[in-house]
Every structure is written in structure tokens, then in C-alpha cells.
Swiss-Prot record:
Similarity-based family: Belongs to the potassium channel family. A (Shaker) (TC 1.A.1.2) subfamily. Kv1.2/KCNA2 sub-subfamily.
Region (Disordered): 1-26
Molecular function GO labels: delayed rectifier potassium channel activity; voltage-gated potassium channel activity
Topological domains, Extracellular: 183-221, 276-289, 348-361, 382-388
Main location: membrane
Site (Important for normal, slow channel gating): 252
UniProt protein name: Potassium voltage-gated channel subfamily A member 2
Membrane-spanning residues: 161-182, 222-243, 255-275, 290-310, 326-347, 389-417
Keywords associated with the record: Cell junction, Cell membrane, Cell projection, Endoplasmic reticulum, Glycoprotein, Ion channel, Ion transport, Lipoprotein, Membrane, Palmitate, Phosphoprotein, Potassium, Potassium channel, Potassium transport, Synapse, Synaptosome, Transmembrane, Transmembrane helix, Transport, Voltage-gated channel
Site (Important for binding with the scorpion mesomartoxin): 381
Non-traversing membrane segments, not crossing the membrane: 362-373, 374-381
Chain positions covered by the region annotation Tetramerization domain: 1-125
Species, as recorded: Oryctolagus cuniculus (Rabbit)
Amino acid sequence: MTVATEDPADEAAALPGHPQDTYDPEADHECCERVVINISGLRFETQLKTLAQFPETLLGDPKKRMRYFDPLRNEYFFDRNRPSFDAILYYYQSGGRLRRPVNVPLDIFSEEIRFYELGEEAMEMFREDEGYIKEEERPLPENEFQRQVWLLFEYPESSGPARIIAIVSVMVILISIVSFCLETLPIFRDENEDMHGSGMTFHTYSNSTAGYQQSTSFTDPFFIVETLCIIWFSFEFLVRFFACPSKAGFFTNIMNIIDIVAIIPYFITLGTELAEKPEDAQQGQQAMSLAILRVIRLVRVFRIFKLSRHSKGLQILGQTLKASMRELGLLIFFLFIGVILFSSAVYFAEADERDSQFPSIPDAFWWAVVSMTTVGYGDMVPTTIGGKIVGSLCAIAGVLTIALPVPVIVSNFNYFYHRETEGEEQAQYLQVTSCPKIPSSPDLKKSRSASTISKSDYMEIQEGVNNSNEDFREENLKTANCTLANTNYVNITKMLTDV
């Protein structure tokens, strides 16, 4: 007698709701398949399902990582930084946590994040953890003509004509500042300088004749130079305004506010002089108007800050001060406490002295500030033993107070300085990571003409090259075809980044 027995697996599969109803052994095997990654000779092993958690990245996308596959060794080879890959692999294993190894510099780890295409979110998380300050986005106008004009006046490094305009602007600023200083020399001042309002017109009033004389000086050389400078500043400002991508954001930019401050005093002074009537002098209003004009003329000195638009050093200094406002606020607060404390102490220490130089606590504020900042003019000095002890403590406290926030400010300056220098180097250098496809000449011309801003164009060019890399990988997987392409790629990227 023959007894037919069912396979236990079949019986289990026949049960309703059993997990094997949807079980796919091939899919499970594929996800659990191990993959070997060789990083400059150091081999790492992980599972495909670990890498598949982030399919948009270089290692998570099978098509992207295929270009680095070595069929002879059955592994993926990357000639990259080995210590950094520990953190890169942990990013996949932990589900998105990115921690920089202590022995890897910031710039190298940032390059590794970009190479493995972990994405902007991972980069922002890394920068936030490292204390980086988020860079402001600087959009470009959508209109082609406005974009070219905006790049011409706003980005001197974008092209040759833009550099020429920047040089002209710097020369005009310097001429304006030199003229502002020279017109105050005694040899250039009129004998009636006290009645000289703006370098354009001056008025004299004679009591003996009870007459009013007005002498215009529109032919004065300083007025002509000032007018020419204002014409250039106004033209530059209006062109920037009409070509800017955002009219509302244009007036919130500190550089544009400086431009307005540099232009307005001229027109206010000119309008005041032209609108002033002779009878105003008899009514005693001339002195007040001249005082206002002197204050307005003083604002012209802020024109020197226009140089910061063309000076990376001044921009770095401004960014450092902006990032260090909290530390500077603490410094001023500590100095305020010290001034109140030591001015009060030196006043009471010198109170019994007959020839005391500290008649009151407010009078001692100046001495406390000078002593705490270690300037020490010597115009006010304590003479008693108690006053000298207070002065010694004041100087020591000032040194300690000023020294405490300085390292933080220096650290911020180093950060902005290195970020600026690294950005310039990055814009001039593209690292060859694989065998790219040479872009066609029309695309190359378009890349050179459509956008000429170094940093943003660099990112667009790099993205285009990466896309061509994927197309080329599908056509050629053999490494023998890479040598010539790499040579041509270096020449092309050098030509693109020389702008």
C-alpha cells in the first residue's frame, strides 16, 4: 500500500493568511545580497538594502554606482578619502545621521558629501552641526537681458567688461573721497568759509551796507568733480535697480542703502542752496541752514563704504561683525559695567584731594573708558594711593574684558575668510571623478554666455557634466576608453572655470 504524503511546506502555504502567501525568495535574496566597496584599498561590506534606503544618492542608485564597478574583482572601487567613508557608510546604516570623523578636515568631508551625492538636506545638517552660517541665496533675474546687466554691475568676476566697470566705479569712489578731503585744505577754502554751505554757493552778509550778496560757484572744480561722481553713482544705482531680480529686496540690501546715502546729500544740498532766498539771511535762518548743510556734507564721508562692494576683505569684515554681534554686545555690556564701577571708585578715592581731576562720576567716565581700553591718554590721572590702586585694577579688568570675546570674533573671521578662499578655488577647479562625455560646442557656448557668475555657473556646469557622465557610462563600461576623455575633460573644465 502506498501512502501519499504532502510536503509540509505546501501544507503551510495552503493555510490562509500564512506569510508565505506574499513571500518572494528572490527579492529577499536581492535585498540581503552583500556588496563590497573598495575605498582606496580599504574594503567595506554592506547589504544592498542598506544602500537602497537613499536611492537618490551615488551608492543608493544602481545606475550611478555602476560606473565604479570592477567586474574582475566583483566590487565597487572609489579612489576617495578612506577615513571619511566610515561616516558616509554610517549615514546609510543609521538612516540619515551624519557625523564627521574628528581626523577629517571640514573641507575634505564636505567634498566627500558632494561626491557621494548625499543631497542638500544632508549637507545642511552637516553644516548646522559644525556651526556653519547658512549662506544667503542670491537669485539672478529671469530675463536674459536683465541677467546680463545684473551680472555686469553686480559681479565683477563674471566677465571682462564687468571688471572694467568695477575698476571705473572704484576710481570714481576714490576721486570723490580725495575731493572731499582736499576741499577742506586752507588753500582751497574761501575766506568766507564760515558762510560756505556746500562748495556750490556761498553767501555773505554786510551789516554796513545792509545788503545781501550771493555768489554762485558752479564753475568751482570741486563742484564739477562732485557732480561728475554723482552722475556716475546715480547711473550705477538706477541700472542696478531696474536689473535687480527683486525690487523689494533691493532696498533691504545694506550695500544699496549705502549707495542711497552717498547720493542723497548732493541733491539735498543743491536743492537747499537753489531754494534759499536772500531775505532768509535777514531773518536769521541762514546759520541754521548752513548747520544742516554741514551735517549733510558730513554724510558724504560714508561714501568710502561703497568700496566694500568691490573689496572681498571689507565684505569679510562686515560678515564677521554681523556674525559676532552677540559677542560685541557682551563686550560693550562688560565695558559699561566696568566704566560705572571704576569711575565711581576713582571718584570716591580722589574725593578728599584738593586738586582732584575727577570732580564728578560722569567726568570720570572718560578716564575709565581710556583706562579699560588700555589707551591711556594721561589727560586725567589719579594722584592718591587709593586712586592709583583703582586705576591699576581698571587697566587689568579692561585687558581681561576685551580679551574674552576676541577668540570668538577671530574664529568667525577665519571661517568667512576660508569660506571665501575655498569658494574661489572651487570655482576654478573641477575634480575628475570618472570618464565624462565631452559636451557639444553649442552647449559649451551656451554655458559661457548664458550665465557668467563663477559660483552658481560652476554648480550648473558640474551638474551637466554629471548627467553626461551617466549617459557615457551606459555606452562605455570599459576603463580603457577613459584616458582620452579625462584629458579632454580637464581642458574643457579649465576653460569653463577660467571665467
